């Protein structure tokens, strides 16, 4: 399978640089997986698409202000993007600099260069950085960090992004990118869903900066997926098994929820799904056998990205590419701050040949 099979033309003007004034007022393109039929509407139509007893699975990770600016004590500007917090004093990070710092190099971070840190080790493309400060890493980031807006949002971060680029139910700090499908849910919509009898459960997957890395190989099977930490606790497992037992659907909110649930299913020894607390490198592309997820709420993804591959594996390649073509024609807003899709599973997707 070639990466170029997942290319589509996207006019620059369709990339959303700001969210809608109201979270749930975005547009919703619904794709019926088995038939490929498309329906255009608004996000609140979700209320009519979900049944009492269906289970919505959200990712409750919280985005940290993971981008830091500063300089090496020896001179030379640097930009630090946290990949993950290792403990209260250390981070693993990407560092952009004209010359990469060496172990032992002192860093002065923050717009006023008031925070002292040391680059202690290098792990491939990532740098281990230790803060020489009494405060915890999270406190330091909250004080001097910038929100890590995706590279295709071509503007500096603003104070408003600290809330807008965050789901209303975010709880566990650790992500450097928002699980963006969740951005469309506001409290009134969540209340209406609960009132209808829709069940809710929360996994945690701390989205890493690797989510924005382009696929740099020609053949999909050669791609090595970045690693992210995920948690699928017992209560989620119980809720999934109960929904399946009563004939209801498990609906993942976002590709990160999909990857968490399907990672837990892959690792399960005795049941459909079991608790999972580990790093995952799951790479979902056409031919993948879904075990847990029956429907998916997701945003529109980048051409040739691992996420459009995940959607193609779920709805079928042809149905997915047709939906994206229609979305471009209908001028849907794309990517993190853009519009959403509601997709039901296509059991025939696994048999589809791509690029032949």
Curated annotation (Swiss-Prot):
It catalyses: 7-aminomethyl-7-carbaguanosine(34) in tRNA + S-adenosyl-L-methionine = epoxyqueuosine(34) in tRNA + adenine + L-methionine + 2 H(+). GO terms for cellular component: cytoplasm. Pfam families: Queuosine_synth. Keywords: Cytoplasm, Queuosine biosynthesis, S-adenosyl-L-methionine, Transferase. GO terms for biological process: queuosine biosynthetic process; tRNA wobble guanine modification. It is found in: Cytoplasm. Its EC number is 2.4.99.17. It comes from the Bacteria. The keyword Transferase applies. SUPFAM superfamilies: QueA-like. The keyword Transferase applies. Pathway: tRNA modification; tRNA-queuosine biosynthesis. Its main location: cytoplasm. It is an enzyme of class 2 (transferase). NCBIfam families: PRK00147.1 (NF001140), queA (TIGR00113). Monomer. Belongs to the QueA family. HAMAP family: QueA. Transfers and isomerizes the ribose moiety from AdoMet to the 7-aminomethyl group of 7-deazaguanine (preQ1-tRNA) to give epoxyqueuosine (oQ-tRNA). This is S-adenosylmethionine:tRNA ribosyltransferase-isomerase. It comes from Shigella boydii serotype 4 (strain Sb227). The gene is queA.
């Amino acid at each position: 399978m070639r990466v170029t099979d997942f290319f589509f033309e996207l006019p620059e003007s369709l990339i959303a640089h700001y969210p809608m004034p109201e979270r749930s007022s975005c547009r919703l393109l619904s794709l019926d997986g088995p038939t490929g039929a498309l329906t255009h509407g608004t996000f609140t139509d979700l209320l009519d698409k979900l049944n009492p007893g269906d289970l919505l699975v959200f990712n409750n990770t919280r985005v940290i202000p993971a981008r830091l600016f500063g300089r090496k004590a020896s001179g030379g500007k640097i930009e630090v993007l946290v990949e993950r917090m290792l403990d209260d004093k250390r981070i693993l990070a990407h560092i952009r600099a004209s010359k990469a710092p060496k172990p032992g190099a002192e860093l002065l971070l923050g717009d006023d260069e008031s925070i002292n840190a040391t680059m202690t080790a290098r792990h491939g493309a990532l740098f281990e950085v230790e803060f020489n400060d009494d405060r915890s890493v999270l406190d330091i980031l909250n004080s001097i960090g910038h929100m890590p807006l995706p590279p295709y949002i071509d503007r500096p971060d603003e104070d408003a992004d600290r809330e807008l680029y965050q789901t209303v139910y975010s709880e566990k700090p650790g992500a450097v990118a928002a699980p963006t499908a969740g951005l469309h849910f506001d409290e009134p919509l969540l209340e209406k869903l609960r009132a209808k009898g829709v069940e809710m459960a929360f996994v945690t997957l701390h989205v890493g900066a690797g989510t924005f890395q382009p696929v740099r190989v020609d053949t999909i099977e050669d791609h090595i997926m970045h690693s992210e930490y995920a948690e699928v606790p017992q209560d989620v497992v119980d809720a999934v098994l109960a929904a399946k037992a009563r004939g209801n659907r498990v609906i993942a909110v976002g590709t990160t929820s999909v990857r968490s649930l399907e990672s837990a299913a892959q690792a399960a020894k005795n049941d459909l799904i079991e608790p999972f607390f580990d790093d995952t490198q799951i790479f979902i592309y056409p031919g993948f056998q879904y075990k847990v997820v029956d429907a998916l709420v997701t945003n529109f993804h980048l051409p040739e990205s691992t996420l459009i591959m995940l959607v193609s594996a779920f709805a079928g390649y042809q149905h997915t590419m047709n939906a994206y073509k229609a979305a471009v024609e209908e001028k849907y807003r794309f990517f993190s701050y853009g519009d959403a899709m509601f997709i039901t599973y296509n059991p025939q997707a696994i048999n589809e040949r791509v690029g032949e």
